[in-house]
């Protein structure tokens, strides 16, 4: 854990991705941010210590030890408290690349800044009260969002919608606990115990219902945040790789007429109507003597077991094979979409035989080669998991595994309250579980959380954020 001095010294980091580009940004935050920048900044007689806040300035970065020119820059000065970290912040826009930006960073470190740890700028925003813990976590969700729907969910959480709901539930519990304490301390009336247990029961049932309603969004929220693990399966050479390439809109998998050309599991993300699909193009699942191909087949079996959705591709220009039947049987009961590919060719597959094997499922006929029927596939995927609606902009979704676990614990605590009251337990014992629920909800927004957890959460962020 960092020392108090280390937590609030002046930090610096590169805030843009490494590599070539037009612009790179180096960020400073802390009490000495402006003073350190002033040591290396040159622009006539301009003194950064005297410029107004939230202004940008043209100039040069120069090594003060030897007057060597480092770069031509635009430098922003933003003074506390109206900054991302609520500290003095300086952002230096220099030319992109690796050498220039690293020389600039090393110069700032030499002049008194400390290299920021991953996520430390956002951690300071949290510690300084600019955002709560759930909002801070939404920053990383926003950075990692793979679709506009996932972005909307993250923005919603960053804007404080989840925080507002959690805090309102905590306030409901706090008000109830306060009333219970008053009733316990001043039992002037004969029916005070009955009134107290009634109050506890009503509030526990109300808050639990609110939490359970929130938890109903968890599955969709996690899909939007992490992606829907989708395995494309089928016997060799039915068009799995062609389907992957179509969905990706680019050539990622080898497409040939030779069975077994996909030797491994290929993973790619794709946006299907707002649903982030983690597409897994598997090697054909078949018996093989080829050692390398056999490894791919085993990985395919594992990918199949771990998938949220299966796209099972059959070739309708050929009769059903024993391998097709085995795949249909192996995926029975799982969320799947059955695709009859190569509809542009003469049909040899017996539809009656297939209907007997999957009597209650919709089967989509497509031609990946001619791009026919694939809009229906995308609509089917969105409908399977979101009823056609994905990540509405103003909706609050629970997508974070930590939040889901804490809400589950909070709901269990409230159930213990209800069970205790129904069993006739004393009020002072029942309210312990109510207090425990209040604590669990507090961990979501960071009101009651250990320093070690905070350090762990922010260590998952990228440098410079």
Swiss-Prot record:
E.C. number: 3.6.-.-
Residues annotated as binding GTP: 237-242, 256-262, 281-284
One matching Pfam family: MMR_HSR1
Residue sites binding Mg(2+) per the record: 241, 262
Superkingdom of source: Bacteria
Limits of the TrmE-type G domain: 227-386
Signal peptide range in chain numbering: none
Record note on cofactor: Binds 1 potassium ion per subunit.
Cofactors demanded by this protein: K(+)
Localization per record: Cytoplasm
One example GO MF annotation: metal ion binding
Major localization listed first in the record, in broad terms: cytoplasm
EC class name: hydrolase
Binding site for (6S)-5-formyl-5,6,7,8-tetrahydrofolate: 27, 91, 130, 465
GO annotation, biological process: tRNA methylation; tRNA wobble uridine modification
Protein residues bound to K(+): 237, 256, 258, 261
Annotated Gene Ontology cellular component terms: cytosol
Record bears the keyword Zinc: no
Keywords from the UniProt entry: Cytoplasm, GTP-binding, Hydrolase, Magnesium, Metal-binding, Nucleotide-binding, Potassium, tRNA processing
Subunit structure comment from the entry: Homodimer. Heterotetramer of two MnmE and two MnmG subunits.
The protein's role, per its UniProt record: Exhibits a very high intrinsic GTPase hydrolysis rate. Involved in the addition of a carboxymethylaminomethyl (cmnm) group at the wobble position (U34) of certain tRNAs, forming tRNA-cmnm(5)s(2)U34.
Similarity comment: Belongs to the TRAFAC class TrmE-Era-EngA-EngB-Septin-like GTPase superfamily. TrmE GTPase family.
Stated name of the protein: tRNA modification GTPase MnmE
Organism for this UniProt entry: Enterococcus faecalis (strain ATCC 700802 / V583)
Gene name per UniProt: mnmE
């Amino acid at each position: 854990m960092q020392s108090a001095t280390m937590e609030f010294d002046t930090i610096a980091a590169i805030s843009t991705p490494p590599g070539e580009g037009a612009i790179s940004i180096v960020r400073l935050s802390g009490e000495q941010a402006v003073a350190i920048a002033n040591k290396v900044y040159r622009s006539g007689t301009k003194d950064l210590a005297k410029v107004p806040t939230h202004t940008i300035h043209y100039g040069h970065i120069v090594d003060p030890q030897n007057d060597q020119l480092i770069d031509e820059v635009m430098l922003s000065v933003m003074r506390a408290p109206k900054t991302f970290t609520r500290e003095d912040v300086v952002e230096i826009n220099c030319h992109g690349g690796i050498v220039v930006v690293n020389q600039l960073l090393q110069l700032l470190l030499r002049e008194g800044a400390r290299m920021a740890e991953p996520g430390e700028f956002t951690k300071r925003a949290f510690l300084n009260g600019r955002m709560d813990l759930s909002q801070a976590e939404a920053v990383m969700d926003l950075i990692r969002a793979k679709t506009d729907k996932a972005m909307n969910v993250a923005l919603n959480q960053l804007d404080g919608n989840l925080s507002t709901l959690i805090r309102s539930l905590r306030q409901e519990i706090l008000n109830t606990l306060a009333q219970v304490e008053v009733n316990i301390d001043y039992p002037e009336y004969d029916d005070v115990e009955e009134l107290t247990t009634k109050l506890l029961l009503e509030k526990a049932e109300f808050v639990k219902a609110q939490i359970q309603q929130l938890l109903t969004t968890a599955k969709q929220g996690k899909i939007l945040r992490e992606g829907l693990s989708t395995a494309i399966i089928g016997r060799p050479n039915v068009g799995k790789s062609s389907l992957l390439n179509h969905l990706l809109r680019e050539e990622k998998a080898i497409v040939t007429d030779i069975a077994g050309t996909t030797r491994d599991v290929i993973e790619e993300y794709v946006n299907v109507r707002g649903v982030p699909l983690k597409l897994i193009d598997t090697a054909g699942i078949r018996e093989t003597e080829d050692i390398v191909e056999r490894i791919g087949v085993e990985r395919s079996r594992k990918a199949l077991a771990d998938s949220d959705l299966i796209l099972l591709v059959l070739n309708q220009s050929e009769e059903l094979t024993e391998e097709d039947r085995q795949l249909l049987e192996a995926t029975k009961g799982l969320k799947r979409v059955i695709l009859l590919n190569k509809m542009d060719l003469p049909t040899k597959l017996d539809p009656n035989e297939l209907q007997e094997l999957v009597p209650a499922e919709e089967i989509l006929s497509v031609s990946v080669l001619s791009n026919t029927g694939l809009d229906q596939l995308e609509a089917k995927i969105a409908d399977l998991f979101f009823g056609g609606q994905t990540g509405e902009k103003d909706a609050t979704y629970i997508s974070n595994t930590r939040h889901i676990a804490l809400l589950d614990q909070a709901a269990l605590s409230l159930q213990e309250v209800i069970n205790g009251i129904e069993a006739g337990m004393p009020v002072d014992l029942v309210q312990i579980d109510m207090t425990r629920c209040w604590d669990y909800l507090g961990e979501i927004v960071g009101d009651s959380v250990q320093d070690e957890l905070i350090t762990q959460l922010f260590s998952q962020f990228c440098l410079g954020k």
